[in-house]
Amino acid sequence: MKRELKITLAAALIMLAVTPCFAASKSKKSKTKVRTINVAHTVTNVPYDFLDEKGNADGFEIAVLKAVDELLPEYEFKFHGVSDEELLIGTESGKYQVGTKGAWITEERKKKFLIPSNPLAASVIGIAFRAENADQIKDLESFAKFSGKLIPISPQSAQFSVIQEFNEKNPSNQIKLVPSDVFDIADSYLWVLEDRYDAYFVLKLSYEKNVLKETGPYHQFADKLAYVPYKGIPTWPLFNKKESELAAAYDKAVQTLKENGTISALSQKYFGEDVFNFVSE
């Protein structure tokens, strides 16, 4: 009886000693401040950033950022669907800490925003051309040899700089880069079919949506057009200039998501392929 009493008293003393430790740990965790991060995103950029049928934020970039959020207990991401203009102005001013819109890097954006080390997604870009020339045009290099006669591109477009870069690397096999007065030429596919130009530099997703998809406005020409990808252009989240600590946390989380296969799996879900396979180091 005395032995049982001693054991009971000993157990009680241990519980009294340990309980304050658990209480302190629980109190410390509950007092940890979780900072709300306002993330602006575009609403119609399928499959990168958009609103689903219920009005919820969806898309590949959104999904990656949600996965990033799960790895950062000190932050809670709140998503805001906004216009392209509101995203840029709001992120620069600090109304939003992050903006995501499938953005390519430009010199102007480097001046206005903090660009992290790791991209968020990638846009696959290439050329659409007449299917009858498919035996001669296999890539951008063979197109340059074929004629290099490309639909004019606005100097304000990121595509312009991509072709500039190609020409710099291929001084003896250049593409005819003609500046356009407008950002987007509505009849580009028709101009190619009419032999006015021999190719149209366009995003793969745009080609699939407008030509290959049965409801696409140019689907009737699907058998007369062909497409070859050139490369994947990384897209980046835009951070407010003051958010260096947040950007560093993002970079660390994205690296983890790359290594554990999450980003590749999400790319397969939203694009049907791993778009980073087209991105050269």
Question: What are the residue ranges of the model-derived segments?
Answer:
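Extracytoplasmic small-molecule ligand-binding "clamshell" domains
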Residues: 28-103, 181, 260
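Extended ligand-binding regions for polar small-molecule ligands
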Residues: 62-72, 131-134, 141-145, 149-152, ...
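Periplasmic-binding protein-like
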Residues: 42-44, 121-126, 214-254, 273-281
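Acidic, polar ligand-binding/catalytic clefts
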Residues: 66, 78-144, 223-229
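Bacterial N-terminal signal peptides that target proteins for export
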Residues: 1-9
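Bilobed "Venus flytrap"/periplasmic-binding protein-like clamshell domains
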Residues: 43-46, 54-70, 127-174, 178-184, ...
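Ligand-binding clefts/hinges and TM-proximal coupling segments of bilobed small-molecule sensing domains
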Residues: 23-25, 75-78, 154-177, 220, ...
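A ligand-binding cleft/hinge motif common to bilobed small-molecule-binding domains
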Residues: 86, 92, 100-112, 161-165, ...
